[in-house]
Amino acid sequence: MACQNNLVVKQIIDLYDQISKLKSLKPSKNVDTLFGQLVSTCLPTDTNIDVTNMCEEVKDMRANLIKLCGEAEGYLEQHFSTILGSLQEDQNPLDHLHIFPYYSNYLKLGKLEFDLLSQHSSHVPTKIAFVGSGPMPLTSIVLAKFHLPNTTFHNFDIDSHANTLASNLVSRDPDLSKRMIFHTTDVLNATEGLDQYDVVFLAALVGMDKESKVKAIEHLEKHMAPGAVLMLRSAHALRAFLYPIVDSSDLKGFQLLTIYHPTDDVVNSVVIARKLGGPTTPGVNGTRGCMFMPCNCSKIHAIMNNRGKKNMIEEFSAIE
């Protein structure tokens, strides 16, 4: 078909064909190689390819590929969380997170999300919820460890085994063991308590298709506090073959504040919205709100080089 004539799309289809024939998506040399090639192929952002306008055959392939990526990512996190949790009792697993292949990406993403959040909040959040935290809750860990030293993180996941592994990661840390709390529940069953959080993160892998993603967002809108911030992961350009896209039209009941598309090796785009009904704050077409003061953590801030900071400011300028 015509929409498959693009060379890059052909490469993605070929990789999908190979991945879909794998007997297992658990970490192995073959699995790691194929997904590594897939990510590298999908990273370029200087393309005019719009995955939402492709033919139905490619759209169906993309939907299946996103599910395969999510399954493989879950196995990868489970694998490394198990290894880290099995370290000797006198070792803190959080001191060895660098063994996870994509840890540096989470450091960058955490820094990016903290900076974006600080642009749209006048106070430091005291309680944050992360929905879909998984067996290796790296976003919560990075934010708690490097950026928000006094914030409590409530991590929600439907999988009790994932929460057990995640809890083992932080149980030996004198600080995070007190500030990381885990809840085993389906977010769609969580009706009470969601209004306690200043910020709610919705993981990219919660809602692997448009219908289920919108359903999760609608549920959060119904139960979050007015004025609370919702942070979501989306995808842009070819990266949308790896993760679902969150559009502004999906955010009914929220004021869209920012959509930021990284151009480096951070795959996910970041979407920030505010639940309507709270104090009025400028959105994507207005001026920014007050910035709360970040913690003095130069170690992690050094992760973002000057070029990365410049790109971020330019992106803000384009949005505004």
Swiss-Prot record:
Q: Which UniProt keywords apply?
A: S-adenosyl-L-methionine, Transferase
Pfam families linked to this entry = NAS
In terms of superkingdom, the source organism counts as Eukaryota
The reply on keyword Repressor is no
Which conditions up-regulate this protein? Constitutively expressed.
What this protein catalyses is:
3 S-adenosyl-L-methionine = nicotianamine + 3 S-methyl-5'-thioadenosine + 3 H(+)
Membrane-traversing stretches = none
Carries keyword Metal-binding? no
Question: Which GO MF terms are attached to this record?
Answer: nicotianamine synthase activity
GO terms in the biological process aspect are: nicotianamine biosynthetic process; phloem transport; pollen development; pollen tube growth
Q: What is its EC number?
A: 2.5.1.43
Return the InterPro entries for the record: Nicotian_synth (IPR004298), SAM-dependent_MTases_sf (IPR029063)
Q: Tissue specificity, please?
A: In shoots and roots.
Q: Which enzyme class?
A: transferase
Family recorded in the similarity comment: Belongs to the nicotianamine synthase (NAS)-like family.
Function in brief:
Synthesizes nicotianamine, a polyamine which serves as a sensor for the physiological iron status within the plant, and/or might be involved in the transport of iron.
Name of this chain's protein: Nicotianamine synthase 1
Q: Which organism is it from?
A: Arabidopsis thaliana
Q: Upper lineage ranks?
A: Eukaryota, Viridiplantae, Streptophyta, Embryophyta, Tracheophyta
